[in-house]
Amino acid sequence: MVVNPSQLKAFYKEEGYFVIKNYFNDAEIISLRKVVLKFHELWKEDNKKFYQEEAFNSSLITGSQYLPFNDRVKLFNFISSKKIMAVVKFVIATDPAFMNTQLFFNPVNPTQKDFWHRDCQYDHEIEAQKIAIQETQVVHFRVPLFDELGMELVPGTHARWDNEEEFRVRQEEKGRVSSDNLSTGKKIKLAAGDLLVFSADMIHRGLYGLDRLALDILVFDSAGDFVDYVDDDCLPDISMLDKIDNPTLFINTMNLKSQA
């Protein structure tokens, strides 16, 4: 598999995403899947009502609540592995910092539909969202653990505001709902071993179905104002740092938090 950094950088700048097919081998995915499934089963047990009624994702997979020391170290080593960091550097060349992890799965509720959104809409009103997409953005690095229907993205919306159709659907105005199809949407089917990189603030939705279970690693530019969103518990304990081959991604976040 040949990865062309300059092509991927240019594509991301223009479109707001890119996919590298078969980036991880079977052994890497099997090892990651084992740890993540351990977290997922414990999380489901602990959040039964929420899981049954509405959940489609969880977060803080690297936290201390569900995984023991050694499994957390395995996750931190995957997140900061040469393969991941090489791609991180394509989109955040200087001082990338770790924000969090999320796990995306199918909702139990069969009436629940996938929906269009920009991540920034959960923190900002409309005018602030317009500003957010012109500034430094958080980047998702999605690793599907099983073959899945993938994502639907609106290319280029990391750098432009919604058109009329997109806005009405995303905001559920004038009779539209956020699960309606968009004429500008592009479906990206994913398989175990693929890596999807996309801007958190582009218009996107996950596609429910198949055995959907995808680990998202969220990374931000240290120059951005995001450190307040980082939960201390998702970072490695000091005693873990010498067991992580390349802890720079986490140390950058720790340094930012110490200055906050």
Q: Across the structure, where does each feature detected by a protein language model lie?
A:
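A structural signal for short, well-ordered beta-strand segments
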Residues: T101-L103, F141-V143, L215-V219
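Active-site glycine-rich loop that binds ribose-phosphate moieties when present
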Residues: C120-Q129, G175-N181
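A short secondary-structure junction signal
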Residues: T111-R118, E125-A128, M151-T157, D162-E166, ...
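Secondary-structure boundary elements
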Residues: M85-A97, A132-Q134, P144-G150
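Short edge-strand/loop segments of extracellular domains
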Residues: N106-P107, H158-W161, V219-D225
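Non-heme Fe(II)/2-oxoglutarate
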Residues: K48, L195, D201-A260
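Non-heme Fe(II)-dependent double-stranded beta-helix
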Residues: M1-E14, K21-E127, I238-M240
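Double-stranded beta-helix
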Residues: Q134, V138, P144-I203
